[in-house]
Every structure is written in structure tokens, then in C-alpha cells.
Amino acid sequence: MDAITIEMQVTVVPAEFDDIRTTSLVGYLDARFADLVARLGEPRRYDEAGFKIDAEWLLKDASGLLGALTVYNYKNGRNYNGAHAAPVEQITDWNVGGRGGASVALAKALFGAHFTAA
């Protein structure tokens, strides 16, 4: 049997911290901050020296079938690296957190070729 490609349309809604508890790295995203804001809305922002992230989106599949995702920068922003690092608006390398295959499917549906599974 030949492979069948199925394109999925998903709707994501903001998630709460309880929704993303116990997530871990599932992949990487190559995207401009402005494009993520246009697609996902404004992220949660953190302004704390030594903190490992600067911005984070908490998302979940509205149907509940594909679980939750986090999109965040990790150790590549000013919080972790100081003022000489690029501001969050210039970051293009993002981590994606989730729970296994369902989260990978959700990330692929949302971000297509910009997402690479870990």
C-alpha cells in the first residue's frame, strides 16, 4: 500500500499551567517571533535575570484529542545570556514541549515544515 498523506486542521486555545504540567521537549521550531505572535497571540513574557526562557506560549488542542504544547525559547535570550544577547523579538530558534506523539502531531499540524521532531 502506498503512503497516504492526511492534512489536519486543528484549533488551539490558550492553555493553563495545569494543562502543560509534565511536558517535555518534543521538537524544535524555526520561526520569527512576529510570525508566532501573528499566529498564536502574545506570549507570556518573563523578565528575570538567570531565567532560562524569555517568552512562552501555552497552547492546547480545542478538541482535547492532541493534548497541549508549549513553545518557548531556551537559554538563547537575554534573561539567561544578559544584555548582549538578542532580544526575544529577534529569536528564531524555539523549543516545543508536549507529551509524546500526539503533541508531535499537533505541532506538525500547526507549524508544518517549520517544526522538526526531537
What are these regions (language model features)?
Residues 2-118:
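Residues within mature, well-folded domains
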